[in-house]
Structure formats: C-alpha cells, structure tokens
C-alpha cells in the first residue's frame, strides 16, 4: 500500500523569505539537507505530494506569472536531483476568502483522497507551521515539523525508523506476553522471561539480528514451558511482520553460522508464506531448564506468525552450542532479510 509524504513548500522545501512570498528567483533557497533526506525517503518507498498555501496568487500583489516562474524553477531544482512529486496542490486564496481548500482544511485534496488508497499509519505531513500539524490531524496521518532545530536529516531518520517498529500484547489463560521490536535500532535489548536459557537465546536473536527487542513474558510454567515459548515465538513473528510494513526494499533472504564444533545453517524467505523444516537431533531432554523438543516448535511458531519460509539444520556434539547456534543464525538471517538495500519490492507479484 502506498506511503505518502504530504510536504509543505515555503519554509519546508525552500526557505521562507522575509516577506513570506516567493515571487522572484533571487528569493529561492533550498532548506538545509532537503535533497539527501528526500532521496533517502524516496528510496524507502515514499510518494511525495506537495501541498502549499500561496496567498493571493493572481492578484496585483502576487501576479500569476511571478508565482509560476518561481514554482517551475523549484520543481526543476528537485527533478534535476531525481526528486519528483506525484501530485502538487496549491491553494491561491487568502485566509479572508474562507475557502475549503486552504490548509489545514483538506478540500483541495478530496478528489485525490477518494481515488487513492494509502497507508495512513505510514504517511506523514511535513511542514513548518501549526496549520501543517492541524492538516495532518485532519488527514489522519502523522506529523513532523521542519525548523532550525528539527532538521531534514532528523525528519528522514525519524520517519524511516518509525516505520519499522511494532508492539504486540498477547494475553491468554496460559501466558502474558508484552513484546516490541524496532528493526533499525542498535539499542541494548531488554528481555525478561522466567526461563533464563530461553532469555539468553532471545538475546542472541536480537543482538545478531541488529534490532531492539523489548520483552516481558510470564506463563504457567507449573504446567509446562510449552505455552510460554510458543506464545513468545508467535508474538515475535507478529511484531517483526508488522514492523516490516509493506516490505519495500528489503533483501528478503538470508544465512549460515558455525559455533565451535556446531554448525547451524539456515535459509529464510520472508515471503508471506509459512513453512518450517527443522533438522537436528538432540539427545538431552533439557538444556538450562528448556525442553529441547521446544526448539523446533519455536521456529515453527515463528515461521507461522512471521509469514516466512524457514529451513534450518544444525549438527554438533554440545547441545548448548547447537541450540545457541540456531538462535544466532536466526538473528543473522533476519538481519540480512529485513535490511533495506533496494528501492523496489523483491517480488515479481508486486506483493509479499
């Protein structure tokens, strides 16, 4: 689904002149950092829509031709750098006209909005005024300001990182799972489960996956650890799947890893299709209080919730090392598969 940035012009894309009217070429100056930021956001799959209030176009104070020359020059500047706007909406009225198209009202965009399906949760208004914030509220999308202290670099980083995080609360009669992930964060994860070995394994996934994982898990261990491990895997898969959004630009595939005498190999495809094949033999019933039969089940539950195909095989003699290798290689595979290094969706179907 389309992700849209509704971007103001004066004060956001170009510097606001002293008289608040861009009516001559010598008044045009791009805002600092706007080009690299928009290129980064464009690569991340965002569509750009320009929405601007231009007071009194066509009046003696602001002739149509003066506006047109400057506006075309601005568009040419951006297009010369590979930045294009899918649509441009300009309100020519003054506040006194009390029109339906002047921001923060949305009348100017109504025909476009009726014909366009887009992901509001991943779309933003970017502007320098309070009216831009109100405009975002009226559209039902997010907002980020541009100012001397909140730069385009900060805006691009915030949008890209925000688009790749998710939280899942899973509460059943057997377990309570509170989990969140942020895929583009190198913060130290905070993981708390009542099974220390399982906690340690999840720390390996987050560390080697290069993402921030926050987890608080509790369950009916007096019955069995099955429910806790299964529900944690389901919550983790759901959270990563949500955080990936439309999967635009991801690598999709990944990875292999040795550990001491153990060797774990994995092939993962975040395709939207669930399948898991786990090959490995454990002769011990428990490792660190965790049943070894739950290792394959963790990967199967994760595969189902994530919507991924996972093939994993592990060999070795030290069961701790074998299991740890499985979780580390999962992290490495997720890091590779979730990384965004493309500017397209890696599927000929057009959807993952």
Swiss-Prot record:
The keyword Magnesium is assigned to this record: yes
HAMAP family on file: Bifunc_HisB (MF_01022), HisB (MF_00076)
SUPFAM superfamilies: HAD-like, Ribosomal protein S5 domain 2-like
Organism encoding this protein: Legionella pneumophila subsp. pneumophila (strain Philadelphia 1 / ATCC 33152 / DSM 7513)
Biological process (GO), any one: L-histidine biosynthetic process
EC numbers: 3.1.3.15, 4.2.1.19
Family the UniProt entry places it in: In the N-terminal section; belongs to the histidinol-phosphatase family. In the C-terminal section; belongs to the imidazoleglycerol-phosphate dehydratase family.
Catalytic activity, as annotated: D-erythro-1-(imidazol-4-yl)glycerol 3-phosphate = 3-(imidazol-4-yl)-2-oxopropyl phosphate + H2O; L-histidinol phosphate + H2O = L-histidinol + phosphate
InterPro entries, sorted: HAD-like_sf, HAD-SF_hydro_IIIA, HAD_sf, His_synth_bifunc_HisB, HisB_N, Histidinol-phos, IGPD_sf, ImidazoleglycerolP_deHydtase
Active-site residues (renumbered): 8, 10
Entry binding sites for Mg(2+): 8, 10, 128
The keyword Hydrolase appears for this protein: yes
Gene behind the chain: hisB
GO cellular component terms listed in the entry, alphabetical order: cytoplasm
Pathway: Amino-acid biosynthesis; L-histidine biosynthesis; L-histidine from 5-phospho-alpha-D-ribose 1-diphosphate: step 6/9; Amino-acid biosynthesis; L-histidine biosynthesis; L-histidine from 5-phospho-alpha-D-ribose 1-diphosphate: step 8/9
Primary localization class, coarse: cytoplasm
The protein's name: Histidine biosynthesis bifunctional protein HisB
Record-linked Pfam families: Hydrolase_like, IGPD
Taxon lineage: Bacteria, Pseudomonadati, Pseudomonadota, Gammaproteobacteria, Legionellales
């Amino acid at each position: 689904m389309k992700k849209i940035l509704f971007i103001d012009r004066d004060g956001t894309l170009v510097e606001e002149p002293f008289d608040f009217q861009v009516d001559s070429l010598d008044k045009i100056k791009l805002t600092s950092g706007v080009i690299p930021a928009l290129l980064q956001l464009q690569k991340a799959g965002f569509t750009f829509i320009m929405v601007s209030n231009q007071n009194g176009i066509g009046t003696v104070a602001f002739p149509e031709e003066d506006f047109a020359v400057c506006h075309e020059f601005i568009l040419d500047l951006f297009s010369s750098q590979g930045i294009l706007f899918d649509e441009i909406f300009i309100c020519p009225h003054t506040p006194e006209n009390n029109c339906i198209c002047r921001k923060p009202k949305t009348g100017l965009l109504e025909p476009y909005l009726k014909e366009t399906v887009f992901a509001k949760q991943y779309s933003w208004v970017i502007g320098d005024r309070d009216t831009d914030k109100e405009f975002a509220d009226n559209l039902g999308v997010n907002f980020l300001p541009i100012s001397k202290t909140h730069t385009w670099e900060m805006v691009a980083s915030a949008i890209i990182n925000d688009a790749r995080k998710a939280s899942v609360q899973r509460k059943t009669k057997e377990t309570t799972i509170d989990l969140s992930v942020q895929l583009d964060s190198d913060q130290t994860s905070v993981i708390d489960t009542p099974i220390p070995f399982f906690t340690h394994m999840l720390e390996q996934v987050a560390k080697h996956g290069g993402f921030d994982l926050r987890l608080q898990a509790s369950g009916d261990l007096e019955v069995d650890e099955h429910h806790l491990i299964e529900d944690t895997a389901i919550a983790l898969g759901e959270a990563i799947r949500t955080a990936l959004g439309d999967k635009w630009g991801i690598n999709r595939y990944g990875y292999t890893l040795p550990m001491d005498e153990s060797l774990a190999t994995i092939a993962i495809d975040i395709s939207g299709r669930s399948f898991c094949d786990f090959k490995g033999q454990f002769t011990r019933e428990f490792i660190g209080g965790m049943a070894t039969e739950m290792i394959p089940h963790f990967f199967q539950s994760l595969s189902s919730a994530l919507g991924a195909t996972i093939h994993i095989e592990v060999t070795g003699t030290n069961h701790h090392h074998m299991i740890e290798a499985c979780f580390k290689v999962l992290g490495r595979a997720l890091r590779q598969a979730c990384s965004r290094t493309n500017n397209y969706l890696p599927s000929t179907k057009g959807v993952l």
